[in-house]
Curated annotation (Swiss-Prot):
Basic residues bias: start-end ranges: 203-215
GO cellular component term of the entry, any: TAT protein transport complex
Source lineage: Bacteria, Pseudomonadati, Pseudomonadota, Alphaproteobacteria, Hyphomicrobiales
Source organism (scientific name): Rhizobium meliloti (strain 1021)
Gene Ontology molecular function terms on file: protein transmembrane transporter activity
InterPro entries in UniProt: TatA/B/E, TatB
Protein name: Sec-independent protein translocase protein TatB
Keywords carried by this UniProt record: Cell inner membrane, Cell membrane, Membrane, Protein transport, Translocation, Transmembrane, Transmembrane helix, Transport
Record function comment: Part of the twin-arginine translocation (Tat) system that transports large folded proteins containing a characteristic twin-arginine motif in their signal peptide across membranes. Together with TatC, TatB is part of a receptor directly interacting with Tat signal peptides. TatB may form an oligomeric binding site that transiently accommodates folded Tat precursor proteins before their translocation.
Subcellular location: Cell inner membrane
Amino acid sequence: MLDIGWTELVVIAIVLIIVVGPKDLPPMLRAFGRMTSKMRGMASDFRRQFDEALREADLDDVRKTISDAQSLNPTAALRDAMNPLRQLGNEIKSDLQKATTPDRPPASATPEPLVEPVNTDAVGETAAKATEKVAAAAVSSASRQMDRAADVPKASEPKPAPKPRAQSKKPGTSVTKKAAGETAPKKSPARKAPGEAPAANKSKTRAASRKKGDA
């Protein structure tokens, strides 16, 4: 430990025997052994403390490395690494969409004419007026047709043929009857005046009176 050989130990023992004497040499050797044991204990304690300090230093380093590893977030690193790939994918998608979609014509710069709102009340009023006018015209035309139909005389209708009467003895009366019968249908298609009807009745009464006189 102290780099002392056997010869040196022998020299030291001789010097101690001469100086201390044979009586005091054993207790001195005991004290020397105790001192050496204490020194060895102190050295061992120092080594232990030194080893503990080294271990603590190593543990601190290990703790630092562990804390650094815990502080590191692998997901964030992966996201940072994947961001450029995502950007490239988005750019490729946009290019494909532009290539597939046809080019649209540019919008016309001329603004479209604004359509004014139609007033429904005014339209309804005009429609009602038009229907009223049409109804009034239809009523007036119907009334005119009714008036015209009423103006047509009943004499225009075909009269029933006169019944054959008994032949009289005189030929003159029969001739007059035939003449009257021939003239009557010829005048029927013509429109007679309202004053002709009493004249015909008068002629009939005269003919009847003549027949009675002849009889």
